[in-house]
Amino acid sequence: MTILKWALIFLVVSIIAGIFGFTGISAASADIARILFYVFVVIFVVLLILGFTIFRA
C-alpha cells in the first residue's frame, strides 16, 4: 500500500500545482506550475499502475 500512498501524494501535489498554474496568479509561477503539474501527473499514473501490478503483495 506504500506505492499507492505515494501515488495519492503526487496526485494532490499535481492538483495544487494545477490550481496555481491554471488560474493565472502570475506568469512566472504559472509556467513552473504547469510543468510541475504534468510531471506529477505522470509520476502519479506510473506509481498507480505499479501499485496495482508489480508491487502487489
Curated annotation (Swiss-Prot):
TM region positions: 6-26, 35-55
Predominant location: membrane
One Pfam family this sequence matches: DUF1328
Taxonomy, superkingdom: Bacteria
Intracellular or extracellular location(s): Cell membrane
Lipid bilayer topology: Multi-pass membrane protein
Cysteine disulfide partners in this protein: none
GO cellular component: plasma membrane
Entry keyword set: Cell membrane, Membrane, Transmembrane, Transmembrane helix
InterPro entries (alphabetical): DUF1328 (IPR009760)
Similarity comment: family membership: Belongs to the UPF0391 family.
Protein name: UPF0391 membrane protein RPA3029
Taxonomic source organism: Rhodopseudomonas palustris (strain ATCC BAA-98 / CGA009)
